[in-house]
Amino acid sequence: MVTDDGILFSVRETLADIPDPELPCSIVDLGLVESVAMDEHGNVDITLLPTFTGCPALDMIANDVTRLVSDLDAVESCRVHWVFDPPWSTDRITEAGRASLKAHGVTVPTCGGDPSSSGVQLRTSAIACPWCGSRDTRLDSPFGPTRCRTIQYCESCRNTFEDMKRLDPEDGTSSPGAG
């Protein structure tokens, strides 16, 4: 007999194998999975957080999750729920996700925590280039290939790279390249 814990483990393993359609990492490593629950009849509810409101990949992600989780033994049905509270932030990206993004030329801000909890905040717009490590970089365009990314340019190696937009924890708005 398969236990509820065993089924939920299988569900989580399945989620870890579902890639984000726009970024080179899984939805788990990207930090989209907020919760997984199952009732006594095998109905699974998965709560996901979108990176940005209006992200065009939401339907594709929900369809992939529903299809793959529903195919698991002992799962009767799967429902996906998108919620906006708590808001997704780049702090949710796992170390494996950060490494995968960096390997593909996408930088991610360091985990910030609560910016109001410390004294002086020193900020720089210089983002380390994922290709050469130089901080001689600049914002090339606030509009990247998706709503959650910007295009940066490295003056040292003369390569462009993508950067995940930072979210303002106060109002949820994005700011391009504010490292």
Question: At which residue positions do the language-model features occur?
Answer:
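Cys/His-enriched microdomains
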Residues: 53, 127, 152
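Short linker/helix segments within small regulatory modules
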Residues: 141-151
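N-terminal presequence-like segments and adjacent domain-start helices
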Residues: 1-16
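Short edge beta-strands and adjacent turn/loop segments
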Residues: 22-49
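Short functional micro-motifs and their immediate structural scaffolds
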Residues: 134-138, 162
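Short, non-transmembrane amphipathic alpha-helical segments
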Residues: 11, 51-76
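Short cysteine-rich clusters marking metal-coordination/redox-active sites
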Residues: 129-132, 154-157
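Short metal-binding segments enriched for Cys and/or His
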Residues: 156-173
